[in-house]
Amino acid sequence: MKIILIIFTLLVSAGCENTVPEFSGKNAFQYLEKQCSFGPRNPGSLGYKECLTFLLQELVATADTVWTQPFTYDDLHRGGSYDLQNIIARFNPNAEKQILLGAHWDTRPWSDKESDIENQNMPIMGANDGASGVAVLLEITHILKSNPAEIGVTIVFFDGEDLGMSGDNTSYALGSQYFAKNLPIPKPDHAIVLDMVGDKHLHLPIERLSYRHAPRLAREIWKLANRLNLPAFDQSLGYSIFDDHVPLWEFAEIPAIDIIDFDYPHKFDNYWHTQEDTPDKCSPASLEQVGTLLTHHIYGIE
């Protein structure tokens, strides 16, 4: 009798494991390259407009509902005005349990961390800082289309995350600020934001503000990564980073965490906000680790 029970338990466990769809890092990397093929996607640029069209086409093909949330930002530091828009896609919007997955789709108009002064006014390509999180979530949308989840998932591509001036946090994360202050959906149970998740040398400690404001969710996600043997995820605490997760809990009281590798590739040699943030610095394997974690989270929620 014990043998039969053990076999039955193993079969049930195997069946549950098979209900989690496989995430393709290869597909996600193609989405990263596609975004970069438009060039820099800083607001107002040709690349921005072409990428917007591409993202809307992808989401309309997979989601139940898709729309944009337009807003305007007046840059008091540098002057000028920007017409920006968050992109919102919902899957199973009538489900009782709802989560939000987000990433910023804009890229920085300046390479202010460039050592070469002549290049500091050039827009960045943003393969990691811009395209990587969006790439993971685009692959997630195709998984949700083919394998409808029991929970509802809202995917938001935030605009204007990277228009900020150093020292003024309020000039960063503009899209998530506007979204949280003008919440266009019922409040989700929690949110997970992705940023800079494509680094070939991916290292993901627990972002410190995430742990401070959503400790239960942070512990749950990193424990899941540990169970899945995803080596990029480090159980130790990392930096405190003002990112798109902060306005979500600050203005909308949504428990939110940020999955981010800020040392790109490491603290002594960083491609962040330079001309070196290009697809060759990223890898399908890194995207796959993050996407695998999210798929197991989505399909494991009861």
Where are the regions a protein language model picked out?
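Sec-dependent signal peptide recognition
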Residues: 1-7
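C-terminal motif of bacterial Sec signal peptides marking the signal peptidase cleavage site
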Residues: 12-15
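Second-shell loop/turn segments in exported
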Residues: 19-22, 37-46, 73-78, 120-130, ...
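Extracytoplasmic/secreted proteins, especially bacterial periplasmic and envelope-associated proteins
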Residues: 27-34, 50, 54-61, 132-139, ...
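A non-catalytic alpha/beta surface segment that caps or lines the substrate-entry region
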Residues: 33, 40-94
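Active-site-adjacent substrate-binding region
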Residues: 68-70, 74, 81, 199-302
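Structural recognition of the beta-strand scaffold that forms the well-ordered cores
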Residues: 88, 98-102, 154-157, 189-195, ...
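Acidic/histidine-rich catalytic neighborhood of metal-dependent amide-processing enzymes
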Residues: 121-216, 237-240, 244-245
